[in-house]
Amino acid sequence: MVLANKLDRNLRAAEESSDGEDYYEVTDRSSSASVIEADEGGNVISSDDDMSDASDHDDDKIKAQMSKVSFGALAKAQDALSSKQSVDRKRKRGDDTSKSQEDKLEALRERLRQIKAEKLANGTQPSKKAKKSKTKTKTTQDDNVEEKEDSDSDAAPHARSSKHAPAVQSSKRMVSRKRNVVEVKKPVFRDPRFDNVSGPRPEDYVVEKRYSFLKDYRASEIAELRNTIKKTKNEGEKEQLKKKLLSMESQQKARENKERLQDVTREHKKKEKELVKEGKKPFFLKKSEQKKIALVDRFQNMKAKQRDKVIERRRKKVTAKERKNMPDERRTA
């Protein structure tokens, strides 16, 4: 008789839920202790021989069980194993590469921030090479957004694109924090003498006649200024007083020219009114004609020496103007 009529050994197929792989596991439910039995003659059969026979018998059973498994099931199990191994490898590689790329990008961003801070402290603009390096480091869209936010936060407000570009000023205006709950009319100070409410505005020559005493006051002021210039010994003060005297004299001349033009227009209006009464059409003088008549009147009222001085001064002024408009080649020749 064999060591055991029945060895409690079975083949059990177990399917893993993680990868869908079919495999078979051999489980031994018998006790590990060896059993010694005697044959019909009373001879003791060795346990080693029995174990070898049992193992051969088990191998035969396993082969018979495996022969019943279809090739399709084996192919599916092999594909599942290979796909799982490839996914695991990709995950490991992806984790390593993503971590290394993130570390490199973070180091580059930190370096760029340091360069920006140094350049802003020195008051210089970033160079074109730095801008090119920035564009190279922008690999993904997320990195672009982060770098734009960093540049906006680090950049100075209203910074120029280059030193030759015009200064940029924002068109936005800050809203005032003060709020007028009750609107009050702003007080307006007015002079009734020059306001239309008190009547029509008088003509200029009428105003000048009313305030004619100002002419005498200005003339006396100019005379006093000339005396002070003669008495002062300090050169700096003398130069300032001379400038003041020159401006006052030029203002007086401008007033005289204006009065002369007003006189010309007044006389012309009187003549035209008389002609209109006779039935003729009115004729209005141009500005240029008014200036010509005023200039003729001015030269007629001058003395001979004064007239020569004015003509010589005017000639020099005209020649200087012509020389200024002349080309450089003719001017130096």
Swiss-Prot record:
- In which residue ranges is the amino acid composition biased (Acidic residues)? 16-25, 143-153
Protein's organism:
Pyrenophora tritici-repentis (strain Pt-1C-BFP) (Wheat tan spot fungus)
Gene it is expressed from: RRP36
What is a single cellular component term in the Gene Ontology annotation? nucleolus
| Coiled coil spans | 92-122, 219-281
Basic and acidic residues biased stretches: 1-15, 54-63, 93-119, 252-275, 319-333
Give a short account of what the protein does: Component of the 90S pre-ribosome involved in the maturation of rRNAs. Required for early cleavages of the pre-RNAs in the 40S ribosomal subunit maturation pathway.
| Extent of Basic residues compositional bias | 128-137
- The identity of this protein, by name, is rRNA biogenesis protein RRP36
The cellular location(s) given in this protein's UniProt record come to:
Nucleus, Nucleolus
So which domain of life are we looking at? Answer: Eukaryota
